[in-house]
């Protein structure tokens, strides 16, 4: 991971979990908390920072995930954090570096699938399955509600993990809240059908013209799961616009057209206040569909920006 995905300790907001309610269904307060957990999941190389931030949020660290992955995709490791409150177990997965997003999009569009779940994401979930399962089982025994979350490719790893826990005969997971931010299409119809127990409590947030949720293209037969909440470039997300049932948006062709129009009409303003030099100017140089994908953009659209 590059410094794009890491945030100075003093920029992690102490109010990230102020609106978190483990007993609620979808709320923007829970979405904010989950997106901040996704941001922290990018920091697995900095154990002291993770400890300090979890303490700031009054969370208990259960595990830090960092495991090598052998995959057809450009994925070196599965990274994540497992933490808990007295009422919730939270499993958060990191995604990919913003500078690699264009390479990932190209990877997604090449080749034909051989299974009903994207092999790269399934391999990433398998790499940490035993440790994640142990944490989830412990949370269930302690009567804590399960939250699974991920940004970017981490959202896809979250879906693959949730499906593995559903299919685990001993665990037999049937209740969890799954939040993804800018996640790609992950499952084909057979796997989507098996994901049914969590379909209505899976929430996919998509910011602006983020290109990642539109891939792989539909001719490869991958689709989304859960209920989508979309917002315009710059936000805000509106809880009232969450549909009551599944929808497979955004469409590949529509997002691609938007991206092409942005390139033709000129550079896109950052939808958030930039971080200090050099990160701010470097983020501004990314393509529009990638700018809308970065954690800074999602946190801003959720009302808890990194740079307040």
Report each predicted region and the residues it spans:
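Non-catalytic, mobile gating and regulatory segments of ester bond hydrolases
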Residues: 1-149, 153-308
């Amino acid at each position: 991971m590059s410094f794009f995905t890491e945030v100075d300790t003093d920029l992690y907001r102490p109010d990230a979990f102020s609106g978190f309610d483990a007993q609620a269904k979808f709320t923007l307060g829970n979405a904010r908390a989950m997106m901040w957990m996704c941001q922290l999941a990018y920091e697995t190389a900095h154990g002291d920072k993770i400890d300090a931030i979890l303490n700031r949020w009054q969370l208990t660290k259960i595990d830090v995930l960092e495991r090598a992955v052998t995959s057809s995709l450009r994925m070196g490791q599965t990274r994540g954090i497992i933490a808990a409150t007295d009422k919730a177990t939270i499993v958060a997965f990191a995604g990919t570096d913003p500078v690699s997003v264009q390479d990932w999009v190209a990877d997604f569009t090449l080749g034909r699938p051989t299974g009903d779940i994207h092999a790269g994401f399934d391999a990433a979930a398998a790499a940490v399955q035993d440790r994640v399962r142990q944490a989830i089982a412990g949370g269930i025994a302690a009567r804590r509600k399960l939250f699974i979350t991920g940004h970017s490719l981490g959202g896809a790893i979250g879906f693959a993990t949730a499906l593995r826990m559903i299919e685990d005969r001993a665990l037999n997971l049937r209740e969890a809240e799954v939040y993804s931010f800018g996640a790609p299409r992950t499952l084909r119809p057979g796997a989507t059908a098996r994901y049914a127990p969590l379909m209505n409590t899976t929430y996919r947030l998509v910011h602006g013209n983020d290109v990642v949720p539109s891939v792989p293209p539909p001719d490869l037969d991958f689709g989304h799961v859960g209920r989508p909440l979309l917002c315009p470039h710059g936000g805000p997300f509106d809880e009232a616009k969450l549909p009551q049932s599944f929808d497979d948006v955004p469409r590949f062709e529509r997002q691609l057209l938007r991206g092409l129009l942005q390139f033709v009409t000129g550079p896109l303003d950052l939808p958030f206040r930039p971080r200090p030099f050099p990160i701010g100017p470097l983020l501004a140089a990314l393509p529009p569909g990638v700018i809308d994908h970065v954690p800074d953009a999602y946190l801003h659209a959720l009302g808890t920006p990194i740079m307040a």
